[in-house]
Curated annotation (Swiss-Prot):
PTM-bearing positions, type Phosphoserine: S151
Family statement: Belongs to the inositol phosphokinase (IPK) family.
GO cellular component terms, A-Z: cytoplasm; cytosol; fibrillar center; nucleoplasm; nucleus
Protein name according to UniProt: Inositol hexakisphosphate kinase 1
Amino-acid positions noted as binding substrate in the UniProt annotation, renumbered to this chain: P220, C221, V222, L223, D224, L225, K226, M227, G228
Compartments it resides in: Cytoplasm; Nucleus
Biased composition (Basic and acidic residues): 150-160
Disordered: annotated span: 100-160, 359-383
Pfam families per UniProt: IPK (PF03770)
GO biological process: inositol metabolic process; inositol phosphate biosynthetic process; negative regulation of cold-induced thermogenesis; phosphatidylinositol phosphate biosynthetic process
Organism: Mus musculus
């Protein structure tokens, strides 16, 4: 068993799933739409990801005015594999103790050599979450012949009331419905495979604890945007730098300073999330990027015009903050745009469509009929939106970790991307008034 069994456990977060009397059973974060490291759910308000020391130090060094636009940094946990009574292996988090010998992932996943996936069966188990759509846990068991298979055998048992579907960018056809974002499953399988192959001695791994920025949203619609005109860090090898520059040149990263890295948007007409991944985003033209943004703001029945001003206000605020951050560079970082896919106005619209009635514009509020008093927002309540910067494994600024390269002025590539994103949204708003 894992060497961290004897550690004392501190306070658990709200609705954290306990593993025996000691650790917290980690579950896949079902709303992950992009990235390459698997995000794990620690509790309702907290997620965790493999620790990269540069990213940890960056969170610890954030300027105060940037904290509004980044997830709250909550510390570090030790993570290891543990078996349960059914023979499955789970990822379990324990309080981090400074004296422990732990592994941390200072080499981003895409730089690591490819490994054969061990054959395994993924098993879902329930959690203690209050949110039905988040009742999912993945674990795996190995077989004697597991080393020969190149990809895992997946067994899914749905626990979600809200299915996800990946839309194919070529055919326009949807994949089968599953109970969490397909990209989340992909990242989690890769993470387990890599950690499993490296954990013959039951090593401990360090994971960052971060705020779950979608926990305020009932039906989180998430757009993951890779920001900036450059994606490689100052310490990248010549080979990797060339590879990243090609990706930028062949996508809207070069022309707009921003490209789609993933998204999920709740569709009122079907009751499921429509999903896109980074490969879709890489192939978009400027017009294709506009169309993707339009799709992100469309709920299957209507364009969410009420979202334009709240999102634009957040983006303008972020731009103003970043323009004041001299020497900062956020290479390969992403920007999350989030809103709730099922709010009062949308529910009223869906009700009238279902009943074949004409659309009634007045939203619910104090003066509405009793039949609509259970709906959430009032007429003066703007829709809830959020904008957060994430992924700082390649970020730098003057004096950070004695980095030899020091840059002048703000991150102009990132600001360029924000300017274009704001401009496109303003044009879309004006065209759809």
């Amino acid at each position: 068993m894992c060497v961290c069994q004897t550690m004392e456990v501190g306070q658990y977060g709200k609705n954290a799933s306990r593993a025996g009397d000691r650790g917290v059973l980690l579950e896949p974060f079902i709303h992950q739409v992009g990235g390459h490291s698997s995000m794990m759910r620690y509790d309702d308000h907290t997620v965790c990801k493999p620790l990269i020391s540069r990213e940890q130090r960056f969170y610890e060094s954030l300027p105060p005015e940037m904290k509004e636009f980044t997830p709250e940094y909550k510390g570090v946990v030790s993570v290891c594999f543990e078996g349960d009574s059914d023979g499955y292996i789970n990822l379990v988090a324990y309080p981090y103790v400074e004296s422990e010998t732990v592994e941390q992932d200072d080499t981003p996943e895409r730089e690591q050599p490819r490994r054969k996936h061990s054959r395994r069966s993924l098993h879902r188990s329930g959690s203690g979450s209050d949110h039905k759509e988040e009742k999912a846990s993945l674990s795996f068991e190995t077989s004697e012949s597991s080393q020969e298979a190149k990809s895992p055998k997946v067994e899914l048992h749905s626990h979600s009331d809200v299915p996800f579907q990946m839309l194919d960018s070529n055919s326009g056809l949807s994949s089968e419905k599953i109970s969490y974002n397909p990209w989340s499953l992909r990242c989690h399988k890769q993470q387990l495979s890599r950690m499993r192959s490296e954990s013959k001695d039951r090593k401990l791994y360090k994971f960052l604890l971060l705020e779950n920025v979608v926990h305020h949203f009932k039906y989180p619609c998430v757009l993951d945007l890779k920001m900036g005109t450059r994606q490689h860090g100052d310490d990248a090898s010549a080979e990797k730098a060339a590879r990243q520059m090609r990706k930028c040149e062949q996508s809207t990263s070069a022309t707009l300073g921003v490209r789609v890295c993933g998204m999920q948007v709740y569709q009122l007409d079907t009751g499921h999330y429509l999903c896109r991944n980074k490969y879709y985003g890489r192939g978009l033209s400027i017009e294709g990027f506009r169309n993707a943004l339009y799709q992100y703001l469309h709920n299957g029945l209507d364009l969410r015009r009420d979202l334009f001003e709240p999102i634009l206000s957040k983006l303008r605020g972020l731009k103003a903050v970043l323009e004041r951050q001299a020497s900062y560079r956020f290479y390969s970082s992403s920007l999350l745009v989030i809103y709730d896919g099922k709010e009062c106005r949308s529910e009223l619209r869906l009700k009238h469509v279902d009943m074949g009635l004409p659309e009634v514009p007045p939203p619910c509020g104090p003066s509405t009929s009793p039949s609509s008093t259970s709906l959430e927002a009032g007429p003066s309540s703007p829709p809830k939106v959020d904008v957060r910067m994430i992924d700082f494994a390649h970020s730098t600024f003057k004096g950070f970790r004695d980095d030899p390269t020091v840059h002048d002025g703000p991150d102009r590539g990132y600001v360029f991307g924000l300017e274009n994103l704001i401009s496109i949204m303003e044009q879309m708003r004006d065209e759809n008034q």
